[in-house]
C-alpha cells in the first residue's frame, strides 16, 4: 500500500515538470524571434536613411536636418567642426578689432594710419563672414563641405586672425595706457567740477551765515532797547566828555552796529592798556542800534577810567548825499540793481564777487573811515579799529611811530604776486593804468594809525571823492572800501611791523599760534566771525575771553560762548 502511494505521487510530479519546460522554451523562442525582427527593421531603416537625401528631393529641408541630427549624431563631419571653430575665431577677432578701433577714435590718437588698418581689418572680417561658402556651411543646411574650398577659407581666416593679433599686441600697451590716461582725465575733470560746485555752495552758505543776524545778537539788542524804554530817566544822555577832544590822549575810532563786538574791542584795549584812563573810544553806530549801544556802556561802564563817546551817523550833519558821493551812489537805482537784481551783472553770478553781497558794503558805517579828520577836527592822530579785532597788548607805541610825513600807518599784506594793487583795481582802465603800479603792495584795513594833520595837508578826502565819483559805474573797482583806500593813500602809507596786526583768523586755519601770541592786534577778517557758529574753534577762545559774561543780558540771550 505504501509503495503504491509513493508511485502515484511520483508520476504526477513528472508530468508537471515536462509542462513547465515546454512553456519556458516557448517563451524564449518568441523573445528571440522579436529581437531578430527588431534588429532587421532597424537595419533596413538605417540603410534607407543613408541614401534618402540623394534619392528624395521632395522632403523639406527641416525634415532632412532633423533626420541627420537624430540618426547621424555619431557620424559628425570633422570639417564642419573645424569650420565652426574658424567662424567663432573670426567673430571674436572682429569684435576685438572693432573695440580697438572705437578706443582709437575715442582717444583721438594721432596714429591715424593704425586706426585705418583696424578699420580695414574689421571690413575684411565682415566680408569673410558674409562669404556664401562660410555663410551656408555655418547655417547648418546639410550641404557637404569641399575640402579644397574649406582649406582656402581656413587659410584666409587664419591669415586675418594672425594679422589682427599682431596689430593688437603692438598697440595694446599704447592703447591701454592712453585709455587709462583718458579715464583719469575724465575722473579729474568730474572731481574738479564737483569741487568747484562745492566751493561755490560753501561760499554762498558762508555768506548767508555772515550776513545774517544771529538770534543771540538780535536778542541782546532788543533787551538793551527794552531796558532803555523801561527806565528812561536812568539812561538820559550825559553831557559831552571833554576827553573826547583832548589831542594829548589816545583816541580810537570804532564804527559798527554790533554791540557785543564793540564791547569786546573796547574791553580788550582797556584790559591790556598800561594807562587806561588816557584812552578814549569814539564809537559810531546807526540810528537803529544807538540806544542799545548807549545802554550797554551805561550798564557796563569802562574800568580804570577809560572814556567812551557814542554817536550815530546822523549826528554828523555834513555827511549828506550832496557832499559824500558814496551816499548818493548808495541811493542810486544802478547800485540797487547791481546789488539786488538777479541779472547777468549780478555779483552772485561770479563766485569771486560773492563777498560784495555783504550788507556792510551798502552801509555808510563802512565808509566813515574816509571822513575822520572832519569827524574829529581837534585830534592829531587816531587809531582806527574794525569791530572784528582783539587787542592783545598795550598799543600806545603806535602813536610814537614816526610815519615820515605819511598819512596812514598799516601792515602790508602782499607776498609774492598776491595782494598787489593789480588784484583790487581794474588796470584795463586807462586812468588806473596811468596813475598806479599794479605791482604795488597792498595793505590792510582793520588797524590803522592815521595822522590827521597829514591827511588834511594832503587833502585825502578830496582825493577819495574824486575817485569815488569816477567809479559811479563800478568800472575802476567793485564795491568795498579797500580799493578806494588803496587809491586814496597811494604813496601815503607807512609800512608797519607785521606783528602789530595779524590777519586771517576769520578764514585761514593755518595762522600760527606763535604769530598770534606775538601780535598786538589779531583780526578775524573773513566770514567766520568769532560770534558766529561757523567760527573756527582754534581761534574763538582768543575772542570769547574778552566777552563780559557777567552782563545779565548776555546770559539771558544764550550766546553759547
From Swiss-Prot:
Pfam families named in the record: Glyco_transf_8 (PF01501)
Gene3D superfamilies per UniProt: Spore Coat Polysaccharide Biosynthesis Protein SpsA, Chain A
Entry coiled-coil feature ranges: none
EC number(s) given by UniProt: 2.4.1.-
Cysteine pairs bridged by disulfides in the record: none
Cytoplasmic side of membrane: 1-27
Superkingdom of this protein's organism: Eukaryota
Tissue-wise expression: Expressed in roots, inflorescences, siliques, leaves and stems.
Pathways per UniProt: Glycan metabolism; pectin biosynthesis
Record membrane topology: Single-pass type II membrane protein
Subcellular location: Golgi apparatus membrane
GO cellular component annotations of the record: endosome; Golgi apparatus; Golgi membrane; Golgi trans cisterna; trans-Golgi network
Residues the record marks as carrying a glycan: 124, 320, 346, 426
Transmembrane portions of the chain: 28-48
Sequence ranges on the Lumenal membrane side: 49-561
Biological processes per GO annotation: pectin biosynthetic process
Function: May be involved in pectin synthesis.
Protein name (record): Probable galacturonosyltransferase 9
Amino acid at each position: 500500500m505504501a509503495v503504491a502511494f509513493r508511485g502515484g505521487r511520483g508520476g504526477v510530479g513528472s508530468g508537471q515538470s515536462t509542462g513547465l519546460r515546454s512553456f519556458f522554451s516557448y517563451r524564449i523562442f518568441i523573445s528571440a524571434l522579436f529581437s531578430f525582427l527588431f534588429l532587421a527593421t532597424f537595419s533596413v531603416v538605417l540603410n534607407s536613411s543613408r541614401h534618402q537625401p540623394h534619392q528624395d528631393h521632395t522632403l523639406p529641408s527641416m525634415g532632412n536636418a532633423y533626420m541627420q541630427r537624430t540618426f547621424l549624431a555619431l557620424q559628425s563631419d570633422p570639417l564642419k567642426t573645424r569650420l565652426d571653430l574658424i567662424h567663432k575665431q573670426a567673430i571674436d577677432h572682429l569684435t576685438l578689432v572693432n573695440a580697438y578701433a572705437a578706443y582709437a577714435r575715442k582717444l583721438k590718437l594721432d596714429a591715424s594710419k593704425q586706426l585705418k588698418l583696424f578699420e580695414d581689418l574689421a571690413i575684411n572680417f565682415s566680408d569673410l563672414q558674409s562669404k556664401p561658402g562660410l555663410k551656408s556651411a555655418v547655417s547648418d543646411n546639410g550641404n557637404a563641405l569641399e575640402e579644397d574650398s574649406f582649406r582656402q577659407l581656413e587659410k584666409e581666416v587664419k591669415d586675418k586672425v594672425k594679422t589682427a593679433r599682431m596689430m593688437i599686441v603692438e598697440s595694446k600697451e599704447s592703447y591701454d595706457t592712453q585709455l587709462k590716461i583718458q579715464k583719469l582725465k575724465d575722473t579729474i575733470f568730474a572731481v574738479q567740477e564737483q569741487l568747484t560746485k562745492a566751493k561755490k555752495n560753501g561760499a554762498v552758505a558762508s555768506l548767508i551765515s555772515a550776513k545774517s543776524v544771529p538770534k543771540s545778537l538780535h536778542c541782546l539788542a532788543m533787551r538793551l532797547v527794552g531796558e532803555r524804554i523801561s527806565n528812561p530817566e536812568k539812561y538820559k544822555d550825559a553831557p559831552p566828555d571833554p576827553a573826547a577832544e583832548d589831542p594829548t590822549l589816545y583816541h580810537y575810532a570804532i564804527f559798527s552796529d554790533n554791540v557785543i563786538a564793540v564791547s569786546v574791542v573796547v574791553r580788550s584795549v582797556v584790559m591790556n592798556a598800561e594807562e587806561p584812563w588816557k584812552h578814549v573810544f569814539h564809537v559810531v553806530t546807526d540810528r537803529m542800534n544807538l540806544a542799545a549801544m548807549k545802554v550797554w556802556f551805561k550798564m557796563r561802564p569802562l574800568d580804570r577810567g577809560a572814556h567812551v563817546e557814542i554817536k550815530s551817523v546822523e549826528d554828523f550833519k555834513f555827511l549828506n548825499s550832496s557832499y559824500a558821493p558814496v551816499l548818493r551812489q548808495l541811493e542810486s537805482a544802478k547800485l540797487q540793481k547791481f546789488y539786488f537784481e538777479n541779472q547777468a551783472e549780478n555779483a552772485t553770478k561770479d563766485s569771486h564777487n560773492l563777498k560784495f553781497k555783504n550788507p556792510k558794503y551798502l552801509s555808510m558805517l563802512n565808509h566813515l573811515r574816509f571822513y575822520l579828520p572832519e569827524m574829529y577836527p581837534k585830534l592829531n592822530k587816531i587809531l582806527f579799529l574794525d569791530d572784528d579785532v582783539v587787542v592783545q597788548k598795550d598799543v600806545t607805541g603806535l602813536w610814537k611811530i614816526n610815519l615820515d610825513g605819511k598819512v596812514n600807518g598799516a601792515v602790508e599784506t602782499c607776498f609774492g604776486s598776491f595782494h598787489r594793487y593789480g588784484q583790487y583795481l581794474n588796470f584795463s582802465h586807462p586812468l588806473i593804468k596811468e596813475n598806479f603800479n599794479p605791482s604795488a603792495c597792498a595793505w590792510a584795513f582793520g588797524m590803522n594809525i592815521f595822522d590827521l594833520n597829514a591827511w588834511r595837508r594832503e587833502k585825502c578826502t578830496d582825493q577819495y571823492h574824486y575817485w569815488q565819483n569816477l567809479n559811479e559805474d563800478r568800472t575802476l573797482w567793485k564795491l568795498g572800501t579797500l580799493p578806494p583806500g588803496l587809491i586814496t593813500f597811494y604813496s601815503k602809507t607807512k609800512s608797519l611791523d607785521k606783528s602789530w596786526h595779524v590777519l586771517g583768523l576769520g578764514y585761514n586755519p593755518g595762522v600760527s599760534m606763535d604769530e598770534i601770541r606775538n601780535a598786538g592786534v589779531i583780526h578775524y577778517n573773513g566770514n567766520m566771525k568769532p560770534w558766529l557758529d561757523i567760527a573756527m574753534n582754534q581761534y574763538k577762545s582768543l575772542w570769547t575771553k574778552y566777552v563780559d559774561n557777567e552782563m545779565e543780558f548776555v546770559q539771558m540771550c544764550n550766546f553759547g560762548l
